[in-house]
Each structure stands twice: as structure tokens, then as C-alpha cells.
Amino acid sequence: MKVVNLKQAILQAWKERWSDYQWAINMKRFFPRGATWDILNLAEALLEQAMIGPSPNPLILSYLKYAISSQMVSYSTVLTAISKFDDFSRDLCVQSLLEIMDMFCDRLSCHGRAEECIGLCRALMSALNWLLRCAAFYAEKVKEMLEQVAAEGQMKMCLERLEKMLSSTKNRALIHIAQLEETSSWNAVEQSLLKLEESLNGLSNSTLRSQADDCISLIKSIPTMLSVRSEQLNKTGFPTVHAVVLLEGTMNLTGEIQPLVEQLMMVKRMQRIPPPLFMLEIWKACFVGLIESPEGTEELKWTAFTFLKIPQVLVELKNYPHGDKDFTEDVNCAFEFLLKLTPLLDKADQRCNCNCMSLLLQECSKQGLLSEANMTNLTDKRKADREDAPQLQSAENANIQPNPRLILRAEPTVTNILKTMDADHSKSPEGLLGVLGHMLSGKSLDLLLAAAAATGKLKSFAWKFIKLNEFTKHISTENSKSAPVRALLFDISFLMLCHVAQTYGSEVILSESRPADEVPFFETWMLTCMPEEGKILNPDHPCFRPDSTKVESLVALLNNSSEMKLVQINWHEVCLSISAAILEILNAWENSVLTFESIQKITDNIKGKVCSMAVCAVAWLVAHVRMLGLDEREKSLQMIRQLATPLYGDNTLQFYNERVVIMSSILEHMCADVLQQTATQIKFPSTGMDTIPYWNLLPPKKPIKEVLTSVFTKVLEKGWVDSRSIHIFDSLLHMGGVYWFCNNLVKELLKETRKEHTLRAVELLYAIFCLDMQQLTLTLLGHILPNLLTDSSKWHTLMDPPGKALAKLSVWCALSSYSSHNKGQASARQKKRHREDIEDYISLFPLDDTRPSKLMRLLSSNEEDANILSSPNRSMSSSLSASQLHAVSMRDPLNRVLANLFLLISSILGSKTAGTHTQFVQWFMEECVDCLEQGSHGSILQFMPFTMVSELVKVSTMSSPKIVLAITDLGLPLGRRVAAKAIAAL
């Protein structure tokens, strides 16, 4: 008999009562070649014929079961065929369909092409929708008294199948992919869910109801199945948070709030820190910083950071999603924990001469971070604790105003001063001078600057003083009465700007790019003439050699006058000419044309009225002394000494003593390096405080590698980083360079053999790397890791626990750098450092994917794989990643380094040589998954080649559906296909 179509063949088999295997043999004879059974829709044809009557045809059903068992038909076509049956009133038919699902629903798999695997995802979602509709139909039936028992039985069967299907993570993962692939079909599932929930309302059977509720909640969890994370509850100390806060308070008070908030949130997410403990750690770091800060400016900086900046940081943190938790409750809880640390609070109170906790609580309450009731409760508890410490009561000096109170008062004053500075200076220069004079008295200036820095107003503060400094150039209608006022306005603004640049970094002063003819005088002078740490000045630079006629008239003025005249003097020109004038005077002195008495008169003239002249003169002398031999320095140093000694007479201008204090501090900063190099002592007038804190911390005769090792060992023993250590690490990073610093710290990490020590080391190293996260990450991922992974003689160093710890550190650094890099957040401190040039990375990782990269040639240990990878005709598909589909720029060093690191990881996974380096790769990927932010398709995993997914699932610990979902970019159609193929094969 010639069979025309499938339906005829099935009917013939039924008529002749073929057995199932006989049917299969004959079918293959009827349809020998060509299309597969799925394309012929065999499963649907069999079901259609089997379900014609009120009860199913057992013989045709046996053919379908045989086809499923012998894999003639795929699971997806069977599920699709089942989901097309919608006459739920035929109970026996529904039962037999459920039995067919039982055959394979808990062990679904597909080893075909990616398209077939996506087909399985879609079919599974259709089957889920069918089961929901089925359950809803019987839930309605149960309410009819006549058919209640039968309907309950049917509904129970449906719910059991739903439970069985959904209890498998693999099935839920496949549905998750389908939901992203076909949103319209998922909408249909949601509609069926709503219908089932409505039908359950009148259901009296509690067992069925709870069973249905369980299924519903499982289905609702499918779209968010990646975002459920547990918090760490076994730890109470988090040294990374502590160190990040300390680093920011010590070195970056002027930094913007947002990058700090993002960095803290990144640490919180990566380390899974519960919110109350996270905030407790922030407060602990603030109090430790306050207690250990050196007296003077640093103490004021820390006070401003704690009482002004950190409450603002918490306000920003409040804006992040916190689930169903109340943020103010977490803040309250953190303060409750903090109250238990009585010794810490007592020490802070003693240092600050006030009840710090009370002031902090008021500030947080003002910002809406604490309720009134909680604030009162916490304040009362702290008050009671303080009564038990009599030394706090007696130690408090009623005459000394505590810094926290002064800082909180200074903050509104900053705003008022900024308004005053906006006024027209020409109308009332005397009034403005009065305000500035008041600012100079005592520690007012440092208080105001600290408050401005902590509230992000320092840049505009500096800009106002630059504008004032520029205003003093106008001298057209000047008389002897207005000349001293203009001289003082110039001098005070100049000194203040120098002081700001030295205390908070010159980047605070620098404005955004301007045309060359509009750059203010002070900015030009600071960039070209002002000595700073690590800046080498050329004393013969054109900036020190102005118009010779101006220099001659200035020399004559200084030498011949009994005192400096003020009327019609252009102070900007004087400051630029003074360096050349000093050179003339110095030459005359060295050639005995001038006597020491004449030099004294000249230096008195320089420093007697306008201190800025002395600052500019010393700036040039410092550059000059560096260039001289040991025996030639004496007279230059003597001149510095003369200029640094204040003039005590009646004939000085207003506010002279206040200006001298700032001048001395500026000169001490300028001369620090050169005095150390020449072993010279110059006594600067004492301002009653340590003017250069954290300066010159490195021991003079100890190799820097030993210093690095010993400081890191101490920090590791203590378990936290202190401010002094942060500054030492910063100096070592400057001195040794990024590669040296990173390489030696990684070596220290790999020496650790105890698990708890390695974890602590990672937490601390991550914080230390925050000194320059971008550059250290490039070095770690671009140089150090590839060297360790490609050199078989170093593989033993990657064993657990140090290898696992290094994997963790690498992922943390990669995630942080990538996140902040994409937001363009680099602190001013980091921007100042030498940037790695893109060329450094082009040579290591060529842009053109067809050229063999140096990194790939390093893979000497796996000959075949290395050859394939680096061969000129290597196909793009082996390295195609989501980042290329997202068109991420590979001109960027970080993107390039990440892409190549993942290529290397991919080649190690596919290699025939296994070892600790393979294990390292596994730890690296596990950590990536652990730290992943839900929905972050722009994460570092986008650089992973798609081909790597199938290699990864072969590793036992990575062969879970959730991990596959986490590591693939499900926002891309190709990403979904890769994920479906990998999960369906598990």
C-alpha cells in the first residue's frame, strides 16, 4: 500500500492493530528519507487521532509513548501538541495527557542546535500555560456540588504536574529564557495565573489551595530568579568599608559624594553586608579617623567629614532600593550597635571635648535619617553612659570650643561668605577686607575651608578668591588711601589660594579648560612656579624670566627704598618679576656687590608689606637650590631663612600677624623637600600645630619593598588599615609605580596559607587598591594574572586558599573599576597620577582580532589550543562576546584587558591540560556570579566569549542553570540561545 500522508499511516496502523515497535518499523519504511518527524508534526498528528472520542485511543497513545521513548519526536513538539488540547471537560483525555507529561517533564533535555533549545523553552512555557488553564477549569468545577469529588481529583493531578515541572530549577530557567524571548506568551501565562487566583477564591479544600499557592509563588518568582541573595550574618567586622571610609576622609575630603556612595554600595553588594552592620562600620571608621587624626588641619578635616559629609552620604544611600526594609530603622539599628562600643565613643568625646554622638544624632535627624523618637531614645542612652565616665565630665574644658560645634557653625558661614564675595568689590573694598581679615583670625580659615570641602563648595570658594585676585589688577584711579586696601586684597586672596592648593590639592583651584588668554594669574603662577611634592621646577624656565626693564625697576625699588611703595603697583607683575630680581640680588651678593645688611633690607622690603612677594621669591629659590651643588647652596638657603623670618615692626600693613601665620605654613610646605635633601634646618614661626601631617613617613635607609611588606603584615595582623598606613601605601605607590606596588602586594597575598587570613587580606588589599583602582586593576588583570596563568612554573602559587583569594580580589577590582569607569568617576587624586597610555595595551592586545596577540602566544603550556587561538585564520566566533554585539569600544584599555582576560580564561577551560590554573578560572567565574548585580547586562561578563558557556558547564560546580543564566547576556537574542543550549544539555 502506498501511504499518501501521516494521518493515513496512523489510521492504517490502528485498523491493522500494529504493535508499537511494528508501527515504528513500518513508519520508517513509509517515510524513508527527507524531513524529520518533528517537521512532519508526528506528535501532533498522533495526539489529534488519539483524542477524537470522549476517551483517548489507547493504541494510538501507545505509538506516541513509543515515539517519545525512542526519541523519534522531541520533547518540545510533544509539549506544544499537548498545549493545543483545550477541551478540559474530557477528563480521561486530560488524564492521559498528564501521564504523557510524566514521562519526561522532570528530565527535559535537548542536545540539538540552539534554535531547537529555544523551541524547548517556548514549548515548556506553553505547557505551563496549559496546566494553569487546566487547573483553573477544575477549580471552577470543584465549586459545583455534583462534580466536586471528581473535579478535586482532576485538579489535584494538574497541581501535582505543575509542582513537578516547577520544582526543577532547570525547567524554571528554561521558562525564564522563554519569558524574555516571547513577552506576549508570558503575558498569556500571567493572565492564566490571574484566572487561577480568582478561581481559588471560593475553594474550600485547604490542601489544594495551599498546593496551588505554592505553584503560583514559584511561577511569579521566575522573572526574578537571579536576584535573590542572602546576606552575611556570621561576620560583624568589615575592614573594606572601614578602609574605604578612612581613605576618603584622610585623602579625598573634596571628592564628590556620588562616587563614594557608589563605591560603598559596590562593597556592600560584593560582600553581602547587612545594612545596619554596613552603617555601623561607616561610623566606626569615622570615629577611629577622628581619634587618630593629627592635631590641626587634619583634625578639622576629619570633623567636617564625619559631621557634614557622611550624613550627606547616608542621604544618598537612602535613595537606593532597600526592598521592604525601612532605611531609618536600619540607621537606628546601626546607632544602637554603635552605643555598645562605649570605649570608642568615650575616646572620641575626650578628643573632641564634647558629646559627639549627640551632635551626630541631631545632624542625622535634621537630614531625615532618624525619627524624633529614635533620636531622643539614643541621645538619652548615650547621656546615661557618659554619666558613668567621670573623666569625660572633668576633662571637658568649658573655655575651649569643641571642633564639631565649630564645624557645624562654619557650614552656614561658608554660604554667607560666598554671597558676600559675589558682590561688586569696587563699591566697598574696605568692607570686604574686614570680612577677609576676620576669616584669617585663629583657626577660622581652616574651619571654613574644611566645611566648604566637606559640602562640595571648596571649588566655588577658590574660584571666588581667584576672581578677587584678578580684580586687584585694576589700578587706574588709585590714591594712597585705596592702595593699601588693594595690596591687602591681592595678598590675602593669593595666600588663601596657596593655602587651599597645599591643603586640598591644586586640582581644587584648576578651572575647567579655558582659552589661554583667559587663564587667571594665580592659576598660571601655581602651575608653572609653585613647588609641590613630586613636581620639579626649572629655575631658568621662561616663566621666571619676565621683561628685563620691569626686573631692573623692581631691583632698584627693593634696594633703594626704605620701604615698599604701594600706589600704582601691579602686584601680579611684581610676583612674576620677583624671581628674576632675586637672581640679580643673589648674584650681586655672591660677587660681594651687596653686603648682608643690604640683603636684610631687601628681604625686609619683600616680606614687610605683601607676604605674597616672599612666597613667590621662595618658590623660585627652592627650584634654584635643587640645581646647585652642595657648596653653592649656602647663600640661597640663607635668603630663604631671611624671607621666612617675620618682620616685627609698626610699619606693616593691617592683619600682618595673621598673614604671616599663613605665609609660614606655605613656605614650610614649599621648602620641606629641599630642606630634607640639603639637611638644612629653618625655624618657621610655630603656628602651634603640625603643619605638614603625614609628610616624610618612609624610613630613610630601608628598601621600599621591606617597608611595603612590613606595613602590609602589620595591617593584616591588626585586621584594619589606619590613616598613617594609607599614607605610607600612597607614598610607596608613587615611588615604586603601579606594577611594582601591585605585583608585590599580590605576592604577599599568595604567601598566606590560612583561609581566614587570605580573606582578610583580600578585604584589605581591595581597600588599599582604592588608592588608584583603575590603574591597579589594569595592571592586575592585564599583566599579573596572565603571567600567573600562562607560566606553568607559577601554577602552584594559585592553590587554595591564596589562589581562591586572588580570584576574589581580581573580580572585585574588575567590577569596581568597570562600574566607576563607565560612570566616568575618577577622583581628582587619581586624575593627577600618570595615566597608563593606551599604547601600552595595544602592543599587548592588538585591536585586530585576526592578528595573534602576545598574550595568546604566552600559552605555551597548551600547544594545540594556543596554536588554534593565535593562528591568523582563527575565526571570530571563538571570541565573539556580548560586548562586541553591544559595540563596546575596544580603544579603551580596561575593556581591552577584560576582553583578553576572558579569551585567556576561555582557552584554559578548553585546554587539555588541567591544573590549579583551571581551578583558579573556576573560582574567578564563581566569584563573578556571586557578585553579579541582577539585570546588569553591562557587567564584566559581557566580555566573555559565548563559546565559553558550554565549556563552563562541564565544570561540576558551574553546571547549574542559575549560573548559566547569570553568566550570559539574556538581553541579546544570541545570549538567550547560548543559555538555552547550555541549560537544555545539563
UniProtKB/Swiss-Prot annotation:
Motif interval(s): LXXLL motif 1: 128-132
Phylogenetic lineage: Eukaryota, Metazoa, Chordata, Craniata, Vertebrata
Keywords: Activator, Nucleus, Repeat, Transcription, Transcription regulation
Motif (LXXLL motif 6): 855-859
Task of the protein: Component of the Mediator complex, a coactivator involved in the regulated transcription of nearly all RNA polymerase II-dependent genes. Mediator functions as a bridge to convey information from gene-specific regulatory proteins to the basal RNA polymerase II transcription machinery. Mediator is recruited to promoters by direct interactions with regulatory proteins and serves as a scaffold for the assembly of a functional preinitiation complex with RNA polymerase II and the general transcription factors.
Gene Ontology MF terms in the entry: nuclear thyroid hormone receptor binding; transcription coactivator activity; transcription coregulator activity
Record GO biological process: positive regulation of DNA-templated transcription; positive regulation of transcription initiation by RNA polymerase II
Record's protein name: Mediator of RNA polymerase II transcription subunit 24
Top-level taxon of the source organism: Eukaryota
Residue window of motif LXXLL motif 4: 554-558
Pfam families referenced in this protein's UniProt entry, alphabetically: Med24_N
Family: Belongs to the Mediator complex subunit 24 family.
Key word Repeat present: yes
